[in-house]
Amino acid sequence: MSLQSLLSTKIVRATSIADAAFDAVVLVGSQDNVQQFGAIQQVSAIAPAVNNFLKLHSGAFNSTSLVQVDSSVVPSGRLILSGTGNVSRDYDDVRRYQAAARKGISMALSAGVKSPLLITLPNSRFPNAELVAALGALTPVYTPLNVREEENKQKLNQLGLLAIGNSDTSARLEKLVEAYDASFTVCRDVGEAGPERMAPPRVAEYIQGAFANGNIKVTVVDDQSVILKDFPLMAAVNRAANCVKEHQARLIRLEYVGEGETQDTFFVVGKGVTIDTGGCDLKTGGHMFGMCRDKYGSAVVGGFFKAIDVLKPKNIKAVGYMCMVRNSIGSHAYTCDEVITSRSGKRIHIYNTDAEGRLTMLDPLTLAKEEALNAKNPHLFTVATLTGHEVLSYGYYAAIMDNGPAKASGWARRVQNVGDEFGQPIEISRLHPEDFAFHMAECEQADLRQGNTKPSVATLRGHQTPAAFLQMASRIDEHGTNSSHPLKYSHIDMGGCSGDHPSVSFPNPLVTLVAGLVLPHV
């Protein structure tokens, strides 16, 4: 697929509000910006219209309004003023710009606008406000994959971006918005689509198409005998689904090698459960609804690599694994009480088939660990919609858990700051000895127990213990700070941070991962 085919709409770099190519101006700002209008060359012409409107509606910067302006200033005669509300309090953050832009474009769509021009007034407290606003503006413009495939149309003809700054600022904004929008499309297409449209084989087909003729090497493991031999726990989760050819498992490997000498190597493993029935520990009472998004960890991996594909960062190598399975229930389903030997040689005692995510990722993570031992400055990641406990703990925020070497590097703190700056905050959870002790086997048959028989929301430290399990079961724990070969590892439990099904998601923590890992090399 071409870059343009993955964009929600055509992104255009604008130079003036007087450009007749646009049929509305969407202005995002706060009350604090009122005094700045005259001093900002790009928007000074509409200052009188905004000031006059404020005399009629003093709360305009706390809401979204359609304002008629003179066509000699804005050719379309339409100005959509979308206020952020108060952004001066300690707890206000840059996401107010994201929300305001989303509301502004939503109003533009309802007004029949096809080519809006987005302008975000600067705020020294939030240097990334223009980018964050643009990503918010594109959210209602996204068209779901199945609709695009059937109707082949977009909601807008184009979205103009008028950056407040010089030409370099404008060019960088356009480049980043295109990269993020394409990555969002890949993420949403995979993460939101239903379990048949994005069954494991069709995810593989989609990813191969999305990265065709690009900078990412895509390899798909589709031989079920190979998956059974090399990734036995992943195979166990998909055992019931394997009886249906269209539902058979796929392991998708993505690889990027940037220009120049490699300084950092990232291994990112994503959970890709296309529908989570719970397996034999069946989800009942409507709790299965929305479980098509249990593949969103893999979706974030796909989006992360699309951003890399577009931005072409230098001096890094990145390897991704999208672990695509379907946790079905049936005569051949895996069950509790099984003891399965993992790729690492650790024997795993199964307690709960609805804790399948950690099993799905474990063997590919072990493979990534094996590769990392020969890589330059490696950092391993798992990304998953893993536990309800994380949702109860942090709401719509992802949680990151570092092992010893990653913690010593200060990575979680750094990426937390990056998330704040780019409007996608992330929380830090810490691991303690009891998290590791919890997963020690209770019988001689096994080395480790997968979990317990309770849901995570009824388990103490229910989102921290899986990170300990993944370390022990992959033997990453043998590469701690005091070992001869330390390996950095960070587990990210996304919980429900991308939003509520079936609303359009906002890929999370994709913005933060790209900003923290990729942008420093661009």
Swiss-Prot record:
Positions of Zn(2+) 2 binding: K271, D276, D294, E356
Q: Which organism is it from?
A: Caenorhabditis elegans
> PROSITE patterns, from UniProt?
CYTOSOL_AP
Q: Does the keyword Hydrolase apply?
A: yes
Could you give the cofactor binding note from the entry?
Binds 2 Zn(2+) ions per subunit.
Tell me what gene encodes this: lap-2
Tell me what this protein is called. Answer: Putative aminopeptidase W07G4.4
Swiss-Prot/TrEMBL keywords = Aminopeptidase, Hydrolase, Metal-binding, Protease, Zinc
What's the short name of a Pfam family annotated to this entry? Peptidase_M17
**PANTHER family per the record?**
DIPEPTIDASE B, ISOFORM A, LEUCINE AMINOPEPTIDASE-RELATED
Report one GO cellular component. Answer: cytoplasm
Keyword Cytoplasm in annotation: no
The protein's required cofactors: Zn(2+)
Question: Which family is it part of?
Answer: Belongs to the peptidase M17 family.
Q: Name one GO molecular function term.
A: metalloaminopeptidase activity
Annotated GO biological process: proteolysis
Tell me which SUPFAM superfamilies the record gives.
Answer: Zn-dependent exopeptidases (SSF53187)
Active-site residues per Swiss-Prot or TrEMBL entry: K283, R358
Q: Where does Zn(2+) 1 bind?
A: D276, D354, E356
- EC numbers for this chain: 3.4.11.-
